[in-house]
Structure formats: C-alpha cells, structure tokens
Amino acid sequence: MAIPANEIDLARYLEHSLLHPAATEAQVKECCEAAVQFDFPAVCLYPTAIKTARDFLHQRPIQICSVVGFPAGAHTTATKLYEAQEAVENGATELDVMLNLAFVKMGESEKLYQEVAQIVELTKVPIKGILETALLTDTEKRLAAEICLDAGVSYLKTSTGWFGGTTVADVKLLYGITKGRIGIKAAGGIKTVDQAIALIQAGATRLGTSRSIKIMQEREQVSDNPTW
C-alpha cells in the first residue's frame, strides 16, 4: 500500500547531488551545507569532491556518495576497482557504480556479475548499481537488476540523468523485482514535489536530485494548503 503523501518526510529521501562537471570547491561546500540544513541523508559527488565533503561533513551523520564509472560505465573493471577504492580511501561511504551496459546488451551476465561483485567485496561500502533504464528494454532491466542483486548491491539506481530521466514505471518494475530486499534510488529529472512523492509511492527509497533545495522549498510552500 502506497504511503499517504502527507505522511512522507521528503527530506529523508533526498540525496542531494552535485554532478556538474564544472562544479567548484565552493559549490561542493554549498551542497554539503544544504544537506546539513535540511537533514538530507546523503550527498552525491564526483570523486574529486570527496575529500572536500569529508572535511566539511566531519562527524556528521550524512553519507558521502561518490560516482564510479560515471556516466557511461564503459571503463575497464580494473579502472572501476581503482576508482572505487580510491573514493573510499578519500572518504566516500557509499558508491554509485555505473554498470557496463554493453555486458547487459550482449547478455554477458557473468562479466557483469564479476565486475559488480568485485567492487562490493573490495570496498565494503553500500553500492548502488546504476542501470540507466532509458537505454534498456524491460527484459534487460530485469536481467541487470537480478545480477546486481546476486552481486550484493545495496541499491538499484535508475539513471545517471545524462541519457534520460527516471520514471514511475521503472521504479515499479524494479520494486517488483527487489520486493524490498534492497533500496531503490530514483534519479534523473526529479524537479517537483509531485514527482518525488509519486516515485516514493512507487517504491523508491532514495531520490537523487540536484533540485533538493527547491523541492523542499516547494514542499514548505504547499504544506499549509495541501492538495493531496
């Protein structure tokens, strides 16, 4: 049964993302400050920003997520392993790992499994496997999701946002596969309260967005005059 909209604490779902390639150190600090202000569970950043976030968020209960193989996933396994390990050493407490979609398209299930499982085993931190759902058929989404489950990921992430946004249909599909065993991070094009609520009601447990502040401001504005 879907969570009633007026009972959803939006802030605890929002993973505040700063994945613009030209983001400055000052903007990284602003991202982290917003996470503190709104009590977001995590920030999601490029590997080069992890040390800055670690120092800024020192001893605060906010997860620091680094992307790996982002945004295309077309890196060698050795490169992804190095990038993942370095990110953790620099302070990342979670990793969003872009899958090698060619493995999915070619049905190379064992190669995909081995890559993801090695990252899970090496880093010992929660891994979110990014499916890039806009580029996959439903059959391919199911295959990738099941391989990620077997490999030990903690979340499935719908999208990077670079090749198309997340949809309620995709979240429902992934939730039907996972059945609550792991989390689902919806990401890509989430800009409004209505979008956020619909995705949560579909089964998302995290929402990755650069619009977290605007969403919270919108929620505060409409809270006195709810339309749900």
Swiss-Prot record:
Catalytic reaction(s) noted: 2-deoxy-D-ribose 5-phosphate = D-glyceraldehyde 3-phosphate + acetaldehyde
Uppermost EC category: lyase
MF annotations from Gene Ontology: deoxyribose-phosphate aldolase activity
GO cellular component terms, semicolon-separated: cytoplasm
Cross-referenced InterPro entries: Aldolase_TIM, DeoC, DeoC/FbaB/LacD_aldolase, DeoC_typeI
Taxonomic superkingdom: Bacteria
EC number: 4.1.2.4
Cited Pfam families: DeoC
Active site positions, chain numbering: 96, 157, 185
Pathway entry: Carbohydrate degradation; 2-deoxy-D-ribose 1-phosphate degradation; D-glyceraldehyde 3-phosphate and acetaldehyde from 2-deoxy-alpha-D-ribose 1-phosphate: step 2/2
Keyword annotations: Cytoplasm, Lyase, Schiff base
Cross-referenced HAMAP family: DeoC_type1 (MF_00114)
PANTHER family: DEOXYRIBOSE-PHOSPHATE ALDOLASE
Official protein name in the record: Deoxyribose-phosphate aldolase
Organism whose genome encodes this protein: Picosynechococcus sp. (strain ATCC 27264 / PCC 7002 / PR-6)
